[in-house]
Amino acid sequence: MTSERLVILSDMWGVKKGLWITSYLGYLQQYYDIAFYDIQQLANIDVEIKSPENLHRAFVDGGIDTAVAHLIKKESEPSHYLAFSTGGTIAWKANLKGLHMKSLTAISPTRVRFEDLKPCCKTKLIFGENDAFRPDGHWSEKLDLEMEIVPNFGHELYTDEKIIGKVCQHLLSAVLEREHKAKKAG
């Protein structure tokens, strides 16, 4: 059986502060054919002083749109997506612009709160309860989307080993479910 493809989009820090990404890769690489994107590179962002404010501004002032365009150019095969923070917003917007996705698991994509349309795929959103910028319940009801709110965590919950394990378990259970269905059908 061939592996399903999983595209992973980093948060705004990319690989610079992304040692936690290796934990996701460790869990998932034997079950998925993985493509990883550092969203700073996708967005052509090269700010001299990489403070959170400067990086955030660079993404908001055109970087997100650039990354969306580059992602659409690079990805043509329908795949599953796992995306973090701004990477989740990029994946969301790319899907709305026609990038075909089998599923989207987005953790802390707070800027999606400004979106009026939802992706055309199975979507799982996860936010920390203490993330001041997460969308509210009214937004998720309006878009008919379920949000998982994790108690006692903030925006960067995706870097925590417990959350990493939980997210990977969700993605792996989906693989096992698909394999089970394929065996039954075959």
Where are these regions (language model features)?
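A conserved short beta-strand
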Residues: L99-R111
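Short beta-strand/loop motif that positions the catalytic acidic residue
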Residues: K124-F127
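Gly/Ala-rich beta-loop-alpha elbow adjacent to hydrolase catalytic centers
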Residues: L82-A91
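Conserved loop-alpha-helix segment in the C-terminal half of the alpha/beta-hydrolase fold
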Residues: R134-E146
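Serine-hydrolase catalytic machinery in alpha/beta-hydrolase-like enzymes
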Residues: S3-K74
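Hydrolases whose catalytic domains are alpha/beta-hydrolase-1, hotdog thioesterase
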Residues: I90-A94, E115
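Short, conserved loop/helix-junction motifs that constitute active-site signature segments
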Residues: L28, G98-L99, F114-C121, S140-L143
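Catalytic histidine-centered segment of alpha/beta-hydrolase-like enzymes
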Residues: N152-I163
